[in-house]
Swiss-Prot record:
Taxonomic classification: Bacteria, Pseudomonadati, Pseudomonadota, Gammaproteobacteria, Lysobacterales
Alphabetical list of NCBIfam families matching this protein: rpmF_bact
Protein name: Large ribosomal subunit protein bL32
GO terms for biological process, alphabetical: translation
A Gene Ontology molecular function term of the record: structural constituent of ribosome
Family annotation (InterPro entries): Ribosomal_bL32 (IPR002677), Ribosomal_bL32_bact (IPR044957), Ribosomal_zn-bd (IPR011332)
A Gene Ontology term for the protein's cellular component: large ribosomal subunit
Domain of life from the UniProt record: Bacteria
Organism: Xanthomonas oryzae pv. oryzae (strain KACC10331 / KXO85)
Length: 64
């Protein structure tokens, strides 16, 4: 069984935990469709930075 060599002080414990805080997700709005998406990710419609980069099933059905 692992046993620590010496007791960890509250200050040291707090310094270790200082990087564990949760942050809110960064969201962006696409200029073409106005859809909200994660930064640096394409939208559900297949747009990235205002340009169509991938054909999705929903857009293929609408075009037919």
């Amino acid at each position: 069984m692992a046993v620590q060599k010496s007791r960890v002080t509250p200050s040291r414990r707090g310094q270790r935990r200082s990087h564990d805080a949760l942050t809110a997700k960064q969201l962006s709005t696409d200029p073409t469709s106005g859809e909200i998406h994660l930064r640096h990710h394409i939208t559900a419609d297949g747009y990235y930075r205002g340009k169509k980069v991938i054909t999705t099933k929903s857009s293929a059905v609408q075009e037919d």
